[in-house]
Amino acid sequence: GICPRILMECKRDSDCLAQCVCKRQGYCG
């Protein structure tokens, strides 16, 4: 899958879109 290149803050993977995961810096990627 593809993670949309949108800067989104997160606390967990489910806060992110599609195939994105929550990275350590607190943003989806």
Swiss-Prot record:
Alphabetized Gene3D superfamilies for the sequence: 4.10.75.20
Disulfide bond entries: 3-20, 10-22, 16-28
This protein's name: Trypsin inhibitor 1
Where can this protein be found?
Secreted
- Can you tell me which family this protein belongs to? Belongs to the protease inhibitor I7 (squash-type serine protease inhibitor) family.
Domain remark text: The presence of a 'disulfide through disulfide knot' structurally defines this protein as a knottin.
PROSITE patterns given in the database record: SQUASH_INHIBITOR (PS00286)
Which residue numbers mark the site Reactive bond? 5-6
Q: Name one GO cellular component term.
A: extracellular region
Q: What does this protein do?
A: Inhibits trypsin.
Example GO molecular function term? serine-type endopeptidase inhibitor activity
Provide the alphabetized UniProt keywords: Disulfide bond, Knottin, Protease inhibitor, Secreted, Serine protease inhibitor
Q: Which residues form a coiled coil?
A: none
